[in-house]
């Protein structure tokens, strides 16, 4: 990397230049702080006695320490014009010990054996790494495969200070969180996933950073990555300033780092409304500079032949070059299921619009927010007491029959009653009989989604049918000459519908094997009656 490129906002590989860089003997350390009078380094390799670094006109300070080795802790000491000295953590450190506020020389020697996943179908399993701290991660791979997920997406895995939070506010964008284990173990896990044809994605929040004075904030008097005026976001964190060239290089390098050094299949940029709008507030207008930088970050991801994904806290209507975006499109479904069954017909216009929309550029599903909002898991949000499992199945049927990519949060596939919390593990091993039935239904439904081009092909189409009934929906999913009929009943009334087609039933939530009453249809001839049980759902293959 050329230092000029970093200062001009053109660098995407700064992580290989700054921080500790392996040499024949020892390591070279670099940091860029143009307005510092003096920079020193202390660490295990020099008994924590300050050693002066050489400064250059560019603002880069450098030193080679032959005694430095993997695992050594270190800090930088910065002296300003008033002879004030502060200790800081290396902003490019790839390993940080939060409790000691120090950087660590890390081992970057791992070589991946398996290539990234190539697939045009996404069924994403969203995971909070903290929920699996004491688990066998090889078991997670097997579990995700058994559940027909194509990718595991981890909520933020970069280092953060407040372990009571979910990790979206990073204190070290280049450091894997030590709470979750070692970077080496995570790389090996990713390699095993690829061997099993399972993709790995991570969340990355690049709009703001932690305001702890030992981290990036400590540079604000010298080389500030934040705005000079509007420093804090509405979360209370510090905003990255996209107008500053070194901020551009820093963020582009962070994206490139995770994709190259961890061989990830993609990155989901989270809370992108915080980039698109000033302070995340649509009423304050668009942030043109962030929008420009967002385009650069997306291009960076695509140059790594990876998926550029986004999550948006609202209904996403922009035309950026993201491959797919996760938004709040399914919130009407959740609201309707929270209501009494006889009131759900009032949501028909919204749900019909959702069914008829082309969501081929969206990831639809239920994420972690849906499992703690209103202090209830997704499953527990459903109105009622004795028939929640029965009602949950048509929700899943609707999701997996819409034209979109899919995402579920940990536990959604079993109807978990557990509210998501950073303090608790989500139990996936000891299932009730109802959860086993529900999970069997989910596995067959997701398998159908992955198998049928009528459901997963980008050129498939949807035709909404006009059927009589409260909260009753019917539509046809087609690809070329192949067609499927989907019928979903969100209310507690049985329905009989005269069939316009010859049909073969592929899945029915009322099947005995899913804990239902066994009111299935099997083969249906034209003009015969289709029976849809209360809170039932089914998918048919149309023969003619």
Q: Could you describe each region identified by the protein language model?
A:
Residues 1-28, 33, 48-126, 131, ...:
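The feature marks proteins involved in alpha-glucan
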Residues 31, 76, 127, 154, ...:
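Conserved, mostly hydrophobic/aromatic
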Residues 115-118, 128-289, 293, 297-303:
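Substrate-binding/active-site clefts of carbohydrate-active enzymes
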Residues 429-464, 536:
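Aromatic- and carboxylate-lined catalytic core of secreted/periplasmic carbohydrate-active enzymes
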């Amino acid at each position: 990397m050329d230092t000029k490129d970093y200062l001009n906002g053109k660098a995407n590989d700064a992580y290989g230049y700054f921080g500790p860089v392996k040499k024949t003997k020892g390591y070279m350390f670099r940091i860029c702080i143009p307005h510092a009078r003096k920079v020193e380094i202390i660490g295990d390799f020099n008994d924590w006695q300050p050693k002066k670094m050489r400064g250059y006109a560019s603002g880069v300070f450098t030193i080679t320490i032959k005694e430095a080795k993997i695992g050594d802790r270190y800090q930088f000491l910065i002296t300003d014009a008033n002879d004030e000295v502060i200790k800081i953590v290396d902003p490019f450190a790839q390993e940080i010990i939060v409790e000691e506020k120090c950087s660590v020389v890390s081992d970057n020697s791992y070589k991946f054996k398996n290539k990234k996943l190539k697939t045009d179908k996404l069924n994403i399993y969203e995971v909070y790494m903290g929920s699996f701290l004491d688990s066998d991660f090889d078991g997670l791979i097997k579990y995700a495969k058994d559940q027909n997920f194509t990718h595991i997406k981890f909520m933020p895995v970069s280092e953060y200070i407040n372990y009571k939070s979910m990790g979206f506010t990073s204190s070290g964008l280049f450091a894997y969180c030590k709470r979750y284990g070692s970077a080496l173990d995570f790389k090996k896990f990713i390699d095993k996933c690829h061997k099993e044809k399972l993709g790995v994605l991570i969340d990355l929040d690049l709009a703001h950073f932690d305001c702890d004075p030992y981290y990036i904030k400590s540079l604000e008097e010298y080389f500030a990555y934040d705005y000079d005026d509007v420093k804090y976001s509405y979360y209370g964190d510090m905003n990255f300033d996209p107008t500053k060239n070194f901020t551009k290089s820093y963020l582009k390098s962070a994206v490139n780092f995770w994709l190259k050094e961890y061989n990830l299949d993609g990155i989901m940029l989270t809370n992108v409304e915080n980039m698109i709008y000033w302070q995340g507030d649509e009423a304050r207008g668009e942030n043109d500079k962030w929008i420009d930088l967002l385009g650069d970050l997306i291009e960076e991801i695509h140059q790594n032949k990876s998926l550029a994904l986004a999550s948006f806290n609202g209904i996403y209507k922009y035309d950026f070059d993201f491959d797919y975006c996760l938004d709040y499109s399914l919130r009407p479904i959740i609201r309707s299921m929270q209501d009494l069954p006889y009131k759900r017909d009032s949501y028909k216009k919204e749900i019909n619009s959702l069914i008829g929309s082309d969501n081929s550029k969206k990831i639809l599903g239920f994420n972690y927010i849906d499992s703690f909002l209103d202090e209830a898991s997704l499953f527990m949000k459903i109105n009622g007491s004795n028939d929640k499992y029965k009602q949950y199945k048509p929700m899943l049927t609707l999701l997996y029959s819409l034209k979109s990519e899919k995402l579920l949060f940990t536990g959604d596939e079993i109807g978990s009653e557990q509210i998501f919390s950073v303090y608790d593990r989500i139990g996936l091993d000891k299932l009730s009989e109802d959860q086993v039935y529900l999970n069997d239904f989910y596995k067959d439904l997701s398998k159908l989604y992955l198998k049928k081009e009528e459901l997963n092909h980008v050129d498939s189409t949807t035709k909404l049918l006009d059927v009589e009934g409260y909260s009753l929906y019917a539509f046809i999913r087609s690809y070329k000459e192949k067609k499927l009929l989907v019928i979903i009943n969100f209310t507690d009334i049985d329905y009989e519908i005269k069939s316009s087609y010859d049909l073969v039933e592929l899945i029915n939530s009322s099947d005995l094997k899913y804990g239902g009453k066994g009111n299935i249809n099997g083969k249906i001839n034209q003009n015969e009656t289709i029976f849809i049980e209360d809170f039932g759902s089914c998918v048919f293959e149309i023969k003619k």
